[in-house]
């Protein structure tokens, strides 16, 4: 048994990586509420220009993350996951600090791209835990870990808005850099990893990685599932506030209502992910995945017919509970169908598909709503998720038949 296969106090590592994912999720979302305001402060004027630059600085991070993730995953498989976590936390802290000092929009755009290049904390945290936790507890552990990033992402916008109101926009970037540096310190002092470095010659090439997979087709279908999950989530984001305003009519607290409806899926996922992950360890993550996808379809369709914001909020809460099972189930199936030797790359490829979904989802939602209205977005998204449910079921059925 190689050192990388020996679990070393994985429960402590799970706790520390959960805190790291929480801080990373919070740090990323701290600046999200006022990105357009900061773009404006950097000299961009005019409605069209502001919209264009805001979209660019938002999406470029995901684009560069999608490009860089496989490289960092390969390096993690060679050098170990802890060193990549340290590199990511420290690199992002420095970039966030520099963002607070940006003097023009081009500097800010380049720094947002650099943030994507240097990211990768959460996928490598997943890879670290996946290679250390006992296989029969993978679903629970990865489900629990996923709640760290979700919790941070929920808290971040609220904290970022309050900090920006009290201290201004630039100081929030400095505070965010401090949060990421704390993440670096936690990782440095408390995460333990037994890893035997692998020389570049001994590293498996992409073809060998594919050949080493137990079921390459299934792994590809899991990557596609990750992409579609993010497309489905992101397609609703651009139109949610406008749809809520259409449902609520002329009310004074539309921002509060929209914010609440935007956050309820995250709260539900936070509650459901560990429980459904544990259930997946008992009955199989493939069953959890297919059932959660079908439930998502059944909840998305009625969203296009709701008459009040509270009906939408209830459906989104239930959708969040189902969604809380999806990514952990995908990650658990990736663990089952790969080896520790290639875990970093497999999780990084999965992250690349997730980043592509983060970019294409909002574009799809905006295009559909512009052509056919808000309600059509939910129906089209339901169709995309239904396709994914059928595709995933077929891939899992083929694997089962091959085993039999």
From Swiss-Prot:
Q: Where in the cell is it found?
A: Cell inner membrane
- Domain of life where this protein originates: Bacteria
Q: Is Transport among the key words of this record?
A: yes
Q: Which Gene3D superfamilies match?
A: MFS general substrate transporter like domains (1.20.1250.20)
Q: Which residues cross the membrane?
A: 19-39, 56-76, 90-110, 113-133, 144-164, 171-191, 222-242, 254-274, 288-308, 317-337, 376-396
GO-annotated molecular function: transmembrane transporter activity
GO CC, alphabetical = plasma membrane
Q: Does Hydrolase count among this protein's keywords? A: no
Could you tell me the membrane topology recorded for this protein? Multi-pass membrane protein
A Pfam entry, by short name = Sugar_tr
Q: Name the principal localization, coarsely classed.
A: membrane
Q: Which InterPro entries match?
A: MFS, MFS_dom, MFS_MdtG_subfamily, MFS_sugar_transport-like, MFS_trans_sf, Mutidrug-R_MdtG, Tet-R_TetA/multi-R_MdtG-like
Q: Which UniProt keywords apply?
A: Cell inner membrane, Cell membrane, Membrane, Transmembrane, Transmembrane helix, Transport
Cross-referenced NCBIfam families: PRK09874.1
Name the protein family: Belongs to the major facilitator superfamily. DHA1 family. MdtG (TC 2.A.1.2.20) subfamily.
Can you name this protein? Multidrug resistance protein MdtG
Query: Its encoding gene is what?
Result: mdtG
């Amino acid at each position: 048994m190689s050192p990388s296969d020996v679990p070393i106090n994985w429960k402590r590592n799970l706790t520390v990586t959960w805190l790291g994912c929480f801080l990373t999720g919070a740090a990323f979302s701290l600046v999200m509420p006022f990105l357009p305001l900061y773009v404006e402060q950097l000299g961009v004027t005019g409605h069209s220009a502001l919209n264009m630059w805001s979209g660019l600085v938002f999406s470029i991070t995901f684009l560069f993350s999608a490009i860089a993730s496989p490289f960092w995953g390969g390096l993690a498989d060679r050098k170990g996951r802890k060193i990549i976590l340290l590199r990511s936390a420290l690199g992002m802290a420095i970039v966030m600090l520099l963002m607070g000092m940006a003097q023009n929009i081009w500097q800010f755009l380049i720094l947002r791209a650099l943030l994507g290049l240097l990211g990768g904390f959460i996928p490598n945290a997943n890879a670290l835990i996946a290679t250390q936790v006992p296989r029969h507890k993978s679903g629970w552990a990865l489900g629990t870990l996923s709640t760290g990033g979700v919790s941070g992402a929920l808290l971040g916008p609220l904290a970022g808005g309050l900090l920006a109101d009290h201290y201004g926009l630039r100081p929030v970037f400095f505070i965010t850099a401090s949060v990421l540096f704390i993440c670096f310190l936690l990782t440095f002092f408390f995460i333990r990893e037994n890893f035997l470095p692998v020389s570049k010659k001994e590293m498996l090439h992409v073809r060998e990685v594919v050949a080493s997979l137990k079921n390459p087709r299934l792994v590809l279908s899991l990557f596609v599932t990750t992409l579609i999950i993010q497309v489905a989530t992101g397609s609703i984001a651009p139109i949610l506030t406008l749809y809520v305003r259409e449902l609520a009519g002329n009310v004074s607290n539309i921002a509060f209502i929209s914010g609440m409806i935007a956050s309820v899926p995250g709260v539900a996922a936070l509650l459901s992910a560990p429980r459904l992950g544990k259930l997946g360890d008992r009955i199989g993550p493939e069953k959890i995945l297919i059932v959660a996808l079908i439930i998502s379809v059944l909840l998305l369709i009625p969203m296009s017919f709701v008459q009040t914001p509270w009906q939408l909020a209830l459906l989104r809460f239930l959708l969040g509970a189902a969604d809380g099972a999806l990514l952990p189930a995908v990650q658990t199936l990736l663990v089952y169908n790969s080896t520790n030797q290639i875990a970093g790359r497999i999780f990084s490829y999965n992250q690349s598909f997730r980043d592509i979904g983060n970019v294409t989802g909002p574009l799809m939602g905006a295009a559909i709503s512009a052509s056919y209205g808000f309600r059509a977005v939910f129906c089209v998204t339901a169709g995309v998720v239904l396709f994914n449910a059928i595709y995933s079921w077929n891939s899992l059925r083929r694997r089962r038949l091959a085993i039999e």
